Structures are given as structure tokens and as C-alpha cells.
Amino acid sequence: MARTAHIVRETSESHIDLELNLDGTGKTDIDTSVPFYNHMMTALGKHSLIDLTIHAHGDTDIDVHHTVEDTAIVFGEALKQALGDKKGIRRFADATVPLDEALAKAVVDISGRPYCVCSGEPEGYEFCMIGGHFTGSLVRHVLESIAFHAGICLHMQVLAGRDPHHIAEAEFKALARALRFAVEIDPRVDGVPSTKGAL
């Protein structure tokens, strides 16, 4: 069965059209109308090997927050939908990714219990403007929105970093690498990887 999802979400603040394939090769077509976010979501697709198409627009004349948040919500929902009953997945994964002076570690559990813990960001990171429109605080908000709507437990730890762009990119790439292995089918797993029999 194909592990794919296609979700369209429309509100008074944004229009999101997102399609993904968990068993892809990392092909992406991203246009969120927020250039730095395009860069991050392209990296997420590329390094997770999830084929990802996003066409999004919204009230960015007010702020990019609504479009960024709603895109993350839909990505999380699509991830949950594509995972289906979660039979055969590896479930747990972690990845540590550097980008020059920055280093980020992501740990993922596709548990069905949404949780997100972010730690280690340097002081003032949340106030930094990255790429002209994207604040450091939005990185955490994106991670939380993905985790809550995908039903996954995510721990993101910034281990080192000075440049806000590098820190954010290391975080997105670490999440990508962790997702790549967590969603992968393990041929040795029979059924759902939980002693409860359900996730």
C-alpha cells in the first residue's frame, strides 16, 4: 500500500496544498511564499527522502506566522495520514547534524503521543531575524506544530551554534534524518512496533 497523503487546508489566513510520499527519493517542489521557509522545507524533504510538494500562500503582508504555522500543521497531518497503522516501521530514530559551527540533535518516536521538547538554543535566538522574514522563534513553533499534528514525540537539542541560519538549518536537517529512519519499514518487524499492539 502506498504511504502517501495529499491534504488541502484553506482558512481566512492561508491556503495550503501539500502532498508527500514517505517512500520517495527526496524530490521536492516547495513554494510557501516565504523564501527561508522554502529553503528549510526543501532540506527537510531532501534529507528525509520524503517526496514533498507544497504550494502555500497566505496573509504574509501582515506576517509570515500564519502561513508558516499552517504549513507545519498540514505537514504533520499528512505525515500521520501517510503512516497509516504504522505497521512495520522502525518507530525510533535519532540524528545529529552539523552545519559549520552549528550542531543539532533530533530524537523521534512515532508513538501516537504528541510531545515536543526543544533545548539548547543560544540566548536571543528566538528574536533573530533569518532571511528577512523568519524569526528564530518560528523554528520551535514549526517543530511543535509538526510533532503535535503528526502524533510524534520529538526532542530537538541545539548542541552548538552561533549563526541563526546555521542553527535553524541544522535543526531541520536533523529532523529530516531522524524521520528518514523512523518512518522506514523494517523487514524484521511483524506488525506494529509496540507491546500494546497499537500506536
Swiss-Prot record:
GO terms for cellular component: cytoplasm. One of its GO terms (biological process) is L-histidine biosynthetic process. It is found in: Cytoplasm. InterPro entries: IGPD_sf, ImidazoleglycerolP_deHydtase, ImidazoleglycerP_deHydtase_CS, Ribosomal_Su5_D2-typ_SF. It comes from the Bacteria. Its EC number is 4.2.1.19. Pathway: Amino-acid biosynthesis; L-histidine biosynthesis; L-histidine from 5-phospho-alpha-D-ribose 1-diphosphate: step 6/9. It catalyses: D-erythro-1-(imidazol-4-yl)glycerol 3-phosphate = 3-(imidazol-4-yl)-2-oxopropyl phosphate + H2O. Pfam families: IGPD. Keywords: Amino-acid biosynthesis, Cytoplasm, Histidine biosynthesis, Lyase. GO terms for molecular function: imidazoleglycerol-phosphate dehydratase activity. NCBIfam families: PRK00951.1-6 (NF002110), PRK00951.2-1 (NF002111), PRK00951.2-4 (NF002114). Belongs to the imidazoleglycerol-phosphate dehydratase family. This is Imidazoleglycerol-phosphate dehydratase. It comes from Bifidobacterium longum (strain DJO10A). The gene is hisB.
